Amino acid sequence: MTESNLGTESRTATIDNGAFGTRVITFSTGRLARQAAGSVVAQLGETVVLSATTVGRQPKEHFDFFPLTVDVEERMYAAGRIPGSFFRREGRPSEDAILTCRLIDRPLRPSFVKGLRNEVQVVETVLALDPSHPYDVVAINAASMSTKLSGLPFSGPIGATRMAHIDGSWVAFPTHEELVRATFDMVVAGRALPDGDVAIMMVEAEATAHTAKLVADGASAPTEEVVASGLEAAKPAIRELCRAQSELAEVAAKPVAEFPVFLDYSDDVYDAVTELAREDVAEALKIAGKADREEALDRIKARAVEELGPRFEGREKELSAALRSLTKSEVRSRVLREQVRIDGRGPRDIRPLTAEVGVLPRVHGSALFERGETQIMGVTTLNMLRMEQSLDTLSPEKSKRYMHNYNFPPYSTGETGRVGSPKRREIGHGALAERALIPVLPSREEFPYAIRQVSEALGSNGSTSMGSVCASTLGLLSAGVPLKAPVAGIAMGLISDEVEGKTRYVTLTDILGAEDAFGDMDFKVAGTQEFVTALQLDTKLDGIPSDVLAAALQQAYEARQTILEVMQAAIEAPATMSDYAPRVTTVKIPVDKIGMVIGPKGQTINAIQDETGAEISIEDDGTIYVGATNGPAAQAAVERINGIANPTLPKVGDRFLGTVVKTAAFGAFISLLPGRDGLLHISKVGDGKRVEKVEDFLNVGDKVEVEIADIDQRGKIYLDKVRPEGAEAPAEGAAERPAGRDRGDRGPRDRGDRGGRGPDRGDSGDGGDGGEGGESRPRRRTRRS
């Protein structure tokens, strides 16, 4: 299906990137998914996403939240692939799909009318994937467009663009190839205002894995000023996308339908609660401790229900909602008018900080980071690169070396709840903390380990995700990972309201859980002392002025420096690796020798692993990673591998302490180097004594010191036994016996044994066993007729 027949109506948005070319995003509707309330196909290059928005017929009156669901369906056929699962069918959503769901939900949710209780579902299906263009930002625009067409009370459209900082310029909708040269990658969503400006609604951004190298080579570091300029640079693209969506909506959107709106409470309930409890609530909000404060508020709630319940019978939920609204109002008013927060801090103050490393035995690295009542334990595990995570997604990345898992058990907030597989929130928080550390991780060549970082949220009262960033830095350094720089994170909040006829904004540093719930913004910023590594913005407003966000970035920078000082006091440099962590050694071999190291059916590599206790991983380019928990085991494995693939060829006269690997009637085979055996003939085994049977003197596994006596043209090695110093050498031929009486290795022959004829011929020293496998070379006779 080509661009021209994706719909009956279409509009395009054209974004000019100057030297980086133009990007054309097309919105088409009217042909696909016509039974949905609103459907659209969005296309960028050859990336095609179908978005369908549907709405439930009846409202869910018993819900006290807006039931919006966003699903992203990655179809492997979009990339011309068959799923790698057992059933060869797509299963549960990938992490990329879940993160894209969150990207769509965050700007979409605050754009619906307050009090809507009808179920709304937005389903994004990836129909085709251009290898150059990721689908996630296309899906955000598609979701906005299909929702705008559906007739729902929606304040969109919302435009979203990816911005990359490349060679000092901001590029909209960069390709995967261009992102390799980017120092910063940022997804920005917003809506166009009547005055022509753009209000920012959502930001998801990070420095790239190449940032540190690019900056070292002279590129601009993604400082707070650079990031703020990126928010401004995103506005023209967002404005153009909103224009195209609005034009399509004018000709194809359904009229906005009437939906019942369920307000949390009525004015009469709010007035009664305010009159009864305002002073008590104001006093309770001065309690710094979370548990004590919530206990005091619970007592106020119980009293309000008891005293006002008879008056508002059957409206207990309204009483609770009104009390929550009163609490929110008091929190915000105190901040705006007095510059004092719930726990008594000023807007820029940070809660008490503690950082400690090495808190757990046995593990490879561990740390405990606390910020007020937020407590995060970070645990680091190192392993061979073959333990990195394989990815079967539409992303061009096929594996992930650094894996960050975030766990948020219910006890972290003092509550009961479900424990099990991670929820979308946990996946999102883990991904954010992961992206914050990726720019400072050492390369595979510098540190050939797979790294798993687990953040355990043991206590939660504000920004466990940024606490996880700090705990991860400490844990990685504790494990001996040579980070390029330590990273810290901080969560910023925002309170805004009309004060004396003007909208006033107050940015809060290090927000509490209540400030997150009652505030207008959750703005998380992570970075080093030099630049920003990750940030995330969520807002409950229709948008935030970019100058307010720029000021918040600068305020976050100041807080980050304070946190980094505390962390560096706990650990300044990478610690010595744990005794329980594997030591990985890198060996480079010629590609054509990989088969020799592996051996038939893996026999050689398995034997090396079994005998040395090391783990071996082989890359396609001939790089071999050898891991072991102790140095001698790794060294032994490396020597075995080098002996096979990078051998030092032995020469006549070299001495070895070899191992008997096989015995035969004619002698013993001695292992000198991995893959290099030599023959010690039976005549050389007994130190001058008559030898009837090799096993009387040597058995498999015995160590014996030998010297190379000869190497024939085929590379076969013949050995002499090294006699102890002072021992007399046997007389010439003393150890030799007539071939006819002993027959050595000759065995039966078709022509009979010739040994009885004439005098004993014996061997002439070291040349009589030069045949394959050590057999004597038969003498050729010619019969004359």
Swiss-Prot record:
Signal peptide range in chain numbering: none
Where Mg(2+) binds, per the record, is at: D516, D522
Which GO CC terms are listed, alphabetically?
cytosol
Q: Which keywords, in A-to-Z order, does the entry hold?
A: Cytoplasm, Magnesium, Metal-binding, Nucleotidyltransferase, RNA-binding, Transferase
Q: List all Basic and acidic residues biased stretches.
A: 734-764
Q: Where is this region: Disordered?
A: 722-785
Presence of the UniProt keyword Nucleotidyltransferase in the record: yes
Domain called S1 motif: residue spans: 653-722
User: According to the UniProt record, what class of enzyme is this?
Assistant: transferase
Q: Which reaction does it catalyse?
A: RNA(n+1) + phosphate = RNA(n) + a ribonucleoside 5'-diphosphate
Keyword Metal-binding tagged: yes
GO biological process terms, alphabetically, are: mRNA catabolic process; RNA processing
In terms of superkingdom, the source organism counts as Bacteria
One Gene Ontology molecular-function label: magnesium ion binding
CDD domains found in the cross-reference section:
KH-I_PNPase (cd02393), RNase_PH_PNPase_2 (cd11364)
What Pfam family is a match for this entry?
A: PNPase
Q: What is its EC number?
A: 2.7.7.8
Specify the KH domain's residue ranges. Answer: 582-641
Q: Where in the cell is it found?
A: Cytoplasm
Q: What does this protein need as cofactor?
A: Mg(2+)
Task: Fetch the HAMAP family from UniProt.
Answer: PNPase
NCBIfam families associated with the record? polynuc_phos, pppGpp_PNP, PRK11824.1
Q: What family, per the record? A: Belongs to the polyribonucleotide nucleotidyltransferase family.
Q: What does this gene product do?
A: Involved in mRNA degradation. Catalyzes the phosphorolysis of single-stranded polyribonucleotides processively in the 3'- to 5'-direction.
Protein's name in the database: Polyribonucleotide nucleotidyltransferase
- This protein's gene is called pnp
